[in-house]
Amino acid sequence: MKLTTVLVVALLVLAACQFTVTDNSGDDPENPSLRSVGENQNPDSTKTITAWATRDMTNMRRGLNRPSKRCLAGSARCEFHKPSSCCSGHCIFWWCA
């Protein structure tokens, strides 16, 4: 019972941390210095990656198995709050599924 409680609390803490990172991701146009140094400074980059992932998922549903090279393949590192950068559209514990 104690182990289950500890696991549930740990899961809730991790989920809260992810939501905090997502909310403070630095997309504030008034203060671009909040963004991390390695992050792309183009504000449209997320929309573009989302469009690529959507197009690739549509192509896969239609049987056109030609995923774009612009998305991350399976077992690649990804950002938890941007799963659309993965070709599969799923980012699990910072790895594309």
From Swiss-Prot:
Record keyword Repressor present: no
MF term (GO), any: toxin activity
Signal peptide positions on this chain: 1-22
Disulphide bond pairs: C71-C87, C78-C91, C86-C96
The keyword Signal is assigned to this record: yes
Example of a GO cellular component annotation carried by this entry: extracellular region
Tissues expressing this chain: Expressed by the venom duct.
Subcellular location: Secreted
Keywords on record: Cleavage on pair of basic residues, Disulfide bond, Ion channel impairing toxin, Knottin, Neurotoxin, Secreted, Signal, Toxin
Propeptide: 23-68
Region of interest (Disordered), residue spans: 23-46
Role according to the record: Probable neurotoxin with unknown target. Possibly targets ion channels.
Recorded family membership: Belongs to the conotoxin O1 superfamily.
Free-text note regarding domains: The presence of a 'disulfide through disulfide knot' structurally defines this protein as a knottin. The cysteine framework is VI/VII (C-C-CC-C-C).
Full protein name: Conotoxin Cal6.1a
